[in-house]
C-alpha cells in the first residue's frame, strides 16, 4: 500500500509468515482484482503500463476514482512536477480529495507554508457508479471534436467502429443524468 512504510510492510510479512503462509493480501489483490481483469482483457496485461517518469512527458493526466493523497502519497510529487511542466490534470471522483486541491510538498519548506497547491485543473464530481457514463461522455466529446489519431486507431485497435456505434446510441441527456456531470464540464475535460 502507498500508505505503508517499508518497516511496517516488513513487520506485516513477518506476522503473516508466523501463520505458515507466504500469501500477503494487499491492495493489488483485494482492491484491484476487477481492474486487473479488465486491463488483461483490454490491453493484455493486468496492471498499469505507465510509470511516474511518464508523467514528465504527459500533456494531460486523468486521475479517475483515485485518492492519491490518501492512498498513493508518493504520486503527488510526480503530479506536481507534471503540472509544472504544463500538464493539465483532471480529477474524477465522487468526493474531492485534499491532496489534489491543496497539496503541500513535505520535503520543501516553502511547500509547507500557505494553503497548498491546487493540482487538479478540473475536478469532475461524478455520481457514484456514474464513471462509465462519464467516460462515454468524454469519448463522445473527443469523437465529435475530431481529435483522434486515426493512424494509431487503425493500426493498434480492434472494434473501433463498434465502439463508435455504441457511443452514438447514448444520448447526452442520459450521460448527464447517469454521471451527474454537466455536458459543458465533460466537454471541457475532453
Where is each model-derived feature located?
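Cofactor-pocket helix-loop regions in the catalytic cores of large enzyme subunits
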Residues: 1-190
Amino acid at each position: 500500500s502507498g500508505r505503508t512504510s517499508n518497516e511496517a510492510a516488513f513487520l506485516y510479512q513477518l506476522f503473516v509468515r508466523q501463520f505458515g503462509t507466504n500469501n500477503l493480501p494487499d491492495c493489488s489483490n483485494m482492491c484491484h482484482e476487477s481492474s486487473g481483469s479488465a486491463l488483461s482483457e483490454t490491453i493484455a496485461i493486468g496492471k498499469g503500463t505507465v510509470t511516474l517518469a511518464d508523467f514528465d512527458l504527459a500533456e494531460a493526466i486523468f486521475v479517475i476514482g483515485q485518492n492519491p493523497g490518501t492512498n498513493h502519497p508518493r504520486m503527488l510529487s510526480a503530479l506536481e512536477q507534471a503540472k509544472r511542466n504544463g500538464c493539465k490534470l483532471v480529477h474524477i471522483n465522487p468526493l474531492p480529495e485534499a491532496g489534489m486541491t491543496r497539496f503541500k510538498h513535505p520535503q520543501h519548506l516553502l511547500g509547507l507554508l500557505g494553503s497548498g497547491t491546487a493540482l487538479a485543473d478540473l475536478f469532475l464530481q461524478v455520481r457514484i457508479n456514474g464513471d462509465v457514463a462519464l467516460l462515454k461522455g468524454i469519448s463522445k466529446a473527443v469523437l465529435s471534436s475530431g481529435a483522434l489519431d486515426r493512424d494509431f486507431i487503425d493500426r493498434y485497435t480492434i472494434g473501433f467502429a463498434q465502439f463508435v456505434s455504441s457511443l452514438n446510441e447514448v444520448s447526452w441527456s442520459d450521460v448527464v443524468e447517469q454521471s451527474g456531470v454537466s455536458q459543458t464540464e465533460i466537454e471541457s475535460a475532453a
